[in-house]
From Swiss-Prot:
Keywords: Cobalt, Hydrolase, Magnesium, Metal-binding. Induction: By phosphonoalanine or phosphonopyruvate. Divalent metal cations. Co(2+), Mg(2+) or Mn(2+) can be used. The active site is at residue 54. The keyword Hydrolase applies. This is Phosphonopyruvate hydrolase. It catalyses: 3-phosphonopyruvate + H2O = pyruvate + phosphate + H(+). Substrate binds at residues 40-44, 155, 186, 188. Its EC number is 3.11.1.3. Partially inhibited by EDTA. Activity is restored by Co(2+), and to a lesser extent by Ni(2+) and Mg(2+). Unaffected by Cs(2+) and Ca(2+). Activity is reduced by Mn(2+) and Cu(2+). It comes from Variovorax sp. (strain Pal2). Its cofactor is Co(2+); Mg(2+); Mn(2+). Hydrolyzes phosphonopyruvate. Not active towards phosphoenolpyruvate, glycerophosphate, phospho-L-serine or phosphoglycolic acid. The gene is pphA.
Length: 290
């Protein structure tokens, strides 16, 4: 079974599929080892790793090459966050085959204007395109894919933009009609009430995708019980964990005036070498170096 088929089968199964954010291949490998079903190729995390805002500042080629590197490192499906599709429907028609060829099994595209502003800012620009325009972008994406099992996910930002439940449902239905395989509904409310209301009222046939960053109260068991949700994405926990751990270790080294105390608490160099695939390289050396 290919990665694309695995993701499609998971969506069709009715069981909850979990995806963890990653901003480089090493983090993706750790996510796979932890048992997540897939990788979320997060634009927010990649932007943060370059220390720039999540506002389409990084080029498509920068994001695409990282997705290619991640996909080549893990054996689980990669869901690529392509923001607004890097332009209009013409751009989307070009972009989708690039991500498919890079090894992604799905793309998530949101209905904001280009360039976007991050949904996580309370005072950000949350400007949405017309429904008809985004339907065209979805149609372009589905037409451009070579493999029918490649998944196109439409991300509805109406709740983020403060447009209410009715508009969010209207957009979700329109995007399903345009050919989206799933609908990602996003909210930054600190309780799950807004999302739960949307899920309850969702009349569509395609599964929903949730990103519970703002409402961590919902467990996977809670989400699975909703029955309409096919994927849960942990959208930025890798970069947040990395920043917290690095900051703590650096501060401790400065405080201690050296690494003697902190070293025992860190993964060993041997562990890092193992994560680099050293054993595989040594096997190649033994077989082919003459």
């Amino acid at each position: 079974m290919t990665k694309n088929q695995a993701l499609r089968a998971a969506l069709d199964s009715g069981r909850l599929f979990t995806a963890m954010a990653a901003h480089n291949p090493l983090v993706a490998k750790l996510a796979e080892q932890a048992g997540f079903g897939g990788i979320w190729g997060s634009g927010f995390e990649l932007s943060a790793s370059y220390a720039v805002p999540d506002a389409n500042i990084l080029s498509m080629s920068t994001h695409l090459e990282m997705m290619r590197a991640i996909a080549s490192t893990v054996s689980i499906p990669l869901i690529a966050d392509i923001d607004t599709g890097f332009g209009n429907a013409v751009n989307v028609h070009y972009v989708v085959p690039q991500y498919e060829a890079a090894g992604a099994s799905a793309i998530v595209m949101e209905d904001k204007t280009f360039p976007k502003d991050t949904s996580l800012r309370t005072d950000g620009r949350q400007e949405l395109v017309r429904i008809e325009e985004f339907q065209g972008k979805i149609a372009a994406a589905t037409a451009a894919r070579a493999d029918r099992d490649f998944v196109v996910i439409a991300r509805v930002e109406a709740l983020i933009a403060g447009l209410g439940q009715q508009e969010a449902v209207r957009r979700g239905q329109a995007y399903e009609e345009a050919g989206a395989d799933a609908i990602l509904i996003h909210s930054r409310q600190k309780t799950p009430d807004e999302i739960l209301a949307f899920v309850k009222s969702w009349p569509g046939k395609v599964p929903l995708v949730l990103v519970p960053t703002a409402y961590p109260q919902l467990t996977e068991a809670d989400i699975a019980a909703l029955s309409k949700v096919g994927i849960v994405i942990y959208g930025n926990h890798a970069i947040r964990a990395a920043v917290g751990a690095v900051r703590e270790v650096f501060a401790r080294i400065r405080r201690d005036g050296g690494i003697r105390e902190v070293d025992a608490a860190l993964p060993s160099v041997k562990e890092i070498i193992e994560l680099q695939g050293d054993e595989r390289m040594r096997a190649v050396e033994a077989r082919y170096l003459k």
